[in-house]
Amino acid sequence: MERKENCSSEGVLYYARILFVWVCLLGNVGHAVAKRLKVEVETPGTLPELVGKKAKYKVTDLTLKGTLNGRDLCFLREMAGRDKERQSTPGRLRTLDMRGVSFARGGGGYVRHGEWREVQGEHTLPPYLFSECGLAHIVLPERLDTIAEGALGATRISRIVLPENV
């Protein structure tokens, strides 16, 4: 009498392959989903701690409120695809709402563009801030009165919301 096996090695291998594909697909779902984040920076220089290392390169849509200094701006550039030396990063930030932001001196340079660039004033979008970054949409601070040289240069921005007084 011939014995039938319910679990042939070929059948097990087939189902193991299917299971492996599903695990791979499900494991990558988190990377494909856009991540939105709202952050209030009460103390200038603390954006890196508020966002965290794990979320830094995953956030695609960020709303900021508070006062930012050079350290925060350096971190923000990295989130948007460029570091302070203007080298590419894995940052995926594409939408940035800075409506409730002002700037504070301090925290060091955030980008080297000929020379180290630093915050110039409370209501001035700093020079070369988003130069060469991957942003597509940006809402500028409500109280902004000046956009410094190159602040939005060489970007992929397709939509900018300007405050009335600029």
Task: Locate each region found by the language model.
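Bacterial N-terminal signal peptides
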Residues: 16-28
